[in-house]
Amino acid sequence: MLPIPAFLGAKSPAMTIFRKPTLKISEKKKREMPEGLWTKCTGCSEMVHNLALEENLRVCPRCGHHFAMGAAERITLLIDEGSFRETDASMSAVDPLGFKGVATYEERLATYRKKTGLVDAVITGSGSMGGIPVGLAVMDFAFLAATMGSVVGEKITRIIEASTKAKRPVIIVCASGGARMYEGMLSLMQMAKTSGALARHAEAGLPYIAVLTNPTTAGVMASFATLGDITLAEPRAMIGFAGPRVIRETTHQELPAGFQTAEFLLEHGLIDEIVPRAKMRETIITIIRNLTGK
């Protein structure tokens, strides 16, 4: 057997020249992205910095998707600074049916009051827009999907009646999942009550402007949301009575593209105008001036 050359030996010093250096894995922890700084846009799936979102009135700066906006934020956006006076702020719901499920109605109310800081799903009051006195109701979807129960219906009815008495226009910003099932028939009664108040408001020759936001559905859509003298909507808002899945299963038919969107309703004459959030205040002020001559 031929001898193995020394430079090929396992212990040859020459072999150290050709050795692959050992890679050391860093012991440093991965950088974690701080929570609460970014939001994924449901319109374009891009990550949007929360600061940019707030500065843009909760509208995606990339695709224009309108995120949900709280009632207090909308009031600040629409009403002249310092002019808003809330009405019936402490009115709260009771549990007339003693509703029990996974959680009782009272437990759900307590949870959402703590979560949102609201007493119920609507804030009502009076203020001015462009110096013109108005009555205002703004629904907040974050509170039990802004379902309409006895408190929501009563507060909206009261601000309509107060505005009729004071001869003021009424603006209602709508967003709702419908009637509040926890209150049974009492919630359905609010459809007729609010509609009746608006009929008396119209008989007095006073304007009502409805602003439909995403989503406006079911009992609210079938009552005061669609009774406006002028009906405005935010872009791409879902507006309809039953959901698309329920309609498909009931009719066994495919729905048209864009069905139940603000754009579809505008095309078919069911709303008057689609208004981006940034232009909503000036649009409403212009409409009020034209309708009242003020």
Where are each of the predicted segments found?
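Conserved catalytic cores of soluble enzyme domains
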Residues: 174-292
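Residues immediately within or flanking Cys/His clusters that coordinate Zn2+
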Residues: 38, 57
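An N-cap/entry alpha-helix motif that binds or orients negatively charged groups
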Residues: 24-28, 39-40, 67-124
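N-terminal amphipathic/basic-hydrophobic helices that include classical n-h-c signal peptides
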Residues: 1-15
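Short cysteine-rich clusters marking metal-coordination/redox-active sites
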Residues: 41-44, 60-63
